[in-house]
Amino acid sequence: SQAGRTTMCPTELFFFFLSEHSYIRLLPIETRAAEASVAQFKRIPRHWVNIPLDLSDPDNMVQAFAQVAKTKPMPVEQAIQMGFHPDMLESAGKPDIVLVPAWRHAIVNFDHPLLRQGLRILDTPGLNALGSEPELTLSMLPNAQAVIFLLSADTGVTASDMAIWQQHIRQLDDENPISLFAARNKIDVLWDDLAGEAFVQHAIEKIRNDTAKQLGISRDNVLPISAKQALLAKVRKDHELLERSQLADL
């Protein structure tokens, strides 16, 4: 993703050991007009757009993953017929035209040590996806073994954050045994060399305690992290920075 743009459709990441190649498969948004579910479409390969992934070519990876963030213009009436709420959509700059996700669902298959162990990650793009794709809330989320609710550390828990939590996530723990976590990303914005490490740790602990109280979960299940600094640490092979990012806790 890039500034101002993130994944626009639910995206699954996993490793299918019988597949000879890595790939991204994309289900066009127009399939929402059909009565078939995403699970049913998974059994019909011809409806999916297949993009090969070359893990040795960074430019290829960037171009391929950029597809997951794509949008397309559509008349607002057509968007409503597809189940979108117009107030949740971005204007295309023309009267009665809005931007909708180009894809309904994305599947990413590639080899990774964690994915080889059977881990399957489902990334959802936020409230609009949860509210307009019933299969997410009725099937996919309830079948998860753990849900990690990603929040920014440089803002509080917003009203829209609480709406997602209360309407779609909190009750999952009541229906099935499931682990609920909150990851507070961007803790590096709190890093302040002038104030000292004690001040920084106090600020991070306050965020953990406040978040746990607001969401009604254990403080131990609130994980402060910096994904950006963890990535930089991996690239630079900086073990101290990686430890400070706290990604290992996650």
Residue map of PLM features:
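Globular "head" domains of long coiled-coil molecular machines
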Residues: 1-250
